[in-house]
């Protein structure tokens, strides 16, 4: 399955494009920080240091060639006559050899190879990307970059923002606990965070009838809002460098580049859950329900209301938008 889906040339092209996207989104996020009037020069220095030191960890595919995998699987020898202990010993040997072969397996497991996921680890200031995140609906080489920035770009921006959310902002560039914010800045950040809590607390999930827990979901809500903003600004930078509109996709001709970006983001959270699943997620999941990851997040984005010309004061263009990472104050 792996080698039918990917090959060395394709992986190299994907990594090249994604690395460029990461650089653009980091640049975009750096501008968001630099424009903050409530953050002083000393704090900005630490923030830039952390952002510049933030690493990206991809799977090293050289260790997963067909020949290498066949050699490893030769150690998995089972017959009808094999005892349980023999089978267990064979699996143990395979696991040891595989771990030795792949030094990164302690950070990225083989079983999650195709899971579409990325994760920020604050104690290492590192974002890990599973291979599945480089496939639809997050990324596709054949689609315009509006889809890729709205999908994977948002994911990248989301994880970067975690480095500066209510938890990540307490850690340094090398992943150690460090207070690099002034008391006044922490107070302002907390005030802005409280506004997010209040906003999301008002959201009522239709299936369960429960209100969203804005405190439980705070970090993810900050990351959603900051991630979309950083990715969109990075996409605009890409368009400026391109010097023209992207090619249109049949069936989507009526949408602008900017609108396609937000459509790509929104379709990531097209979902349906049972009452039991919804109830469990509402009580335990640090993410807001998918509906509000789209509607509330985009309602806070001026770029969204500008792109779709939403009426001022409407649900998708409220006068009082809640933001942490925006131009100026």
Residue map of PLM features:
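Intrinsically disordered, low-complexity linker/terminal regions across diverse proteins
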Residues: 2-329
């Amino acid at each position: 399955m792996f080698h039918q889906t990917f090959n060395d040339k394709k992986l190299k092209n994907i990594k090249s494009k994604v690395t460029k996207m990461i650089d653009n989104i980091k640049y975009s996020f750096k501008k968001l920080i630099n424009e903050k009037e409530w953050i002083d020069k000393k704090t900005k220095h630490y923030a830039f240091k952390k952002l510049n030191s933030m690493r990206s960890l991809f799977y090293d595919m050289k260790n997963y060639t067909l020949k290498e995998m066949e050699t490893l699987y030769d150690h998995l020898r089972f017959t009808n006559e094999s005892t349980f202990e023999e089978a267990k010993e064979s699996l143990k040997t395979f696991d040891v050899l595989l771990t030795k072969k792949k030094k990164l397996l302690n950070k990225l497991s083989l079983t999650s190879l195709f899971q579409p996921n990325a994760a920020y680890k604050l104690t290492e200031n590192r974002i890990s990307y599973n291979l599945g995140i480089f496939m639809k609906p997050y990324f596709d080489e054949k689609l315009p970059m509006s889809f890729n920035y709205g999908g994977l770009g948002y994911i990248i921006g989301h994880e970067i923002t975690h480095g500066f959310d209510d938890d990540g902002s307490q850690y340094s560039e090398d992943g150690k606990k460090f207070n690099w914010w002034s008391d006044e800045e922490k107070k302002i950040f907390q005030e802005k965070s409280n506004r997010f809590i209040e906003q999301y607390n008002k959201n009522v999930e239709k299936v369960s009838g429960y209100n969203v827990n804005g405190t439980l979901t705070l970090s993810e809500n900050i990351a959603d809002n900051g991630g979309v903003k950083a990715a969109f600004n990075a996409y605009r930078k890409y368009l400026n460098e391109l010097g023209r509109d992207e090619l249109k996709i049949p069936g989507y001709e009526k949408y602008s580049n900017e609108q396609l970006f937000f459509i790509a983001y929104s379709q990531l959270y097209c979902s349906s859950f049972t009452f039991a699943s919804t109830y469990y997620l509402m009580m335990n999941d640090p993410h807001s329900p998918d509906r509000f990851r789209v509607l509330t997040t985009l309602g806070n984005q001026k770029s969204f209301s500008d792109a779709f010309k939403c009426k001022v004061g409407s649900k998708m263009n409220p006068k009082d938008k809640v933001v942490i990472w925006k131009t100026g104050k």
